[in-house]
Amino acid sequence: MDKFTTLEGVAAPLKIINVDTDMIIPKQYLKTIKRTGLGKGLFSEQRYRDDGSENPDFILNKPAYRNAKVLVAGDNFGCGSSREHAPWALLDFGIRCVISTSFGDIFYNNCFKNGILPIRVTQADLDKLFDDAERGANATLTIDLANQEIRGPDGGKATFEIDPFRKHCLLNGLDDIGLTMEKKSAIDSYEDKARRERAWA
């Protein structure tokens, strides 16, 4: 998993509340267990028309936001089913941070496991970030995880809270396997001791 320290990039405003995981990645994309290639399915029912052509009105199809790294979203983002494909699709598209006032619990946890930073902010801060994001190509936000700050294009700042353990994992690029490998020496020592003490086993 890639480390998350400081992220600077265009923020796309998605002013929709209660975006569920079915909307983030529709069911037809759930047949794969690969984490790559799902970016094409991200919000596919909103990004594409019935004939397969792009919907020019959807935010991520607008030229200024095609390479967005941050998504500023309405309340209760990622609610609904537990599909881990939702953060996979966001990550494959290039989004590494989602900012909202609240998230679906399972989606929130899955983001951390996949290297995405979900940030909870107040409604006042979200409204300001929506204003910043609507600047289009100038809608660059800086996400400073170490200092737990969001910096806007005009120099404004918003702070956020994060669990220290999850912060440690993101800063060091540690997924579940990485966390286990951090304890490799202790695991090896335990196994060596167990073999010596229970040679008969």
Swiss-Prot record:
Keywords (A to Z) from UniProt: Amino-acid biosynthesis, Branched-chain amino acid biosynthesis, Leucine biosynthesis, Lyase
E.C. code: 4.2.1.33
Bridged cysteine pairs (disulfide): none
Catalysis performed (reactions): (2R,3S)-3-isopropylmalate = (2S)-2-isopropylmalate
GO terms assigned for molecular function: 3-isopropylmalate dehydratase activity
Gene Ontology cellular-component terms listed: 3-isopropylmalate dehydratase complex
Biological process according to GO: L-leucine biosynthetic process
Pathway(s): Amino-acid biosynthesis; L-leucine biosynthesis; L-leucine from 3-methyl-2-oxobutanoate: step 2/4
Job of this protein: Catalyzes the isomerization between 2-isopropylmalate and 3-isopropylmalate, via the formation of 2-isopropylmaleate.
Family: Belongs to the LeuD family. LeuD type 1 subfamily.
Quaternary structure (record): Heterodimer of LeuC and LeuD.
Protein name (Swiss-Prot/TrEMBL): 3-isopropylmalate dehydratase small subunit
Organism: Nitrobacter hamburgensis (strain DSM 10229 / NCIMB 13809 / X14)
